[in-house]
């Protein structure tokens, strides 16, 4: 019998943006309920939903223009999913307290070949991506209370 404990490391369907239309609304809408964050390699588009308290969903996209090989796109998506999964409990708690929902789109914004470490092997690349993804998610967690206060007009 195996003691496989994958459950804590899942990225459940309830945390994912599934529909293409939801991505379109998230990326193309600009109003007081949306905001953007960028880091060296990644960007976030986020939209607040005051009518759906506590809802948190992530969408992850990596275009062929920035990562030509599917192996590389999968690596970047895995890195972003892991960063999102680790911050999800903190974000969900904050959203629950504030009584709003949030959709977050994460994407690679620079070509993979421009990232330092690409020529030093996959481990150096993973480290660069992981560090930047973690710092971006921490920046989101830090900025979110300010954004929520603006929505309420405080």
Which positions does each model-derived feature cover?
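Positively charged, solvent-exposed patches that mediate nucleic-acid binding
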Residues: 1-154
């Amino acid at each position: 019998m195996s003691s496989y404990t994958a459950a804590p490391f899942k990225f459940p369907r309830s945390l994912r943006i599934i529909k293409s239309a939801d991505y379109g609304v998230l990326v193309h809408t600009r109003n007081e309920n949306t905001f953007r964050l960028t880091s060296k390699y990644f960007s976030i588009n986020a939209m607040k939903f005051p009518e759906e308290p506590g809802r948190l969903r992530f969408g992850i996209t990596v275009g062929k223009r920035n990562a030509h090989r599917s192996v590389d796109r999968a690596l970047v998506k895995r890195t972003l999913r892991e960063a999102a999964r680790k911050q999800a409990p903190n974000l969900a708690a904050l959203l629950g307290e504030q009584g709003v929902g949030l959709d977050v789109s994460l994407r690679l914004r620079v070509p993979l070949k421009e990232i330092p470490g690409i020529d030093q092997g996959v481990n150096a690349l993973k480290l660069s991506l992981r560090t930047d993804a973690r710092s971006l998610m921490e920046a989101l967690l830090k900025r979110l209370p300010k954004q929520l206060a603006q929505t309420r007009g405080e």
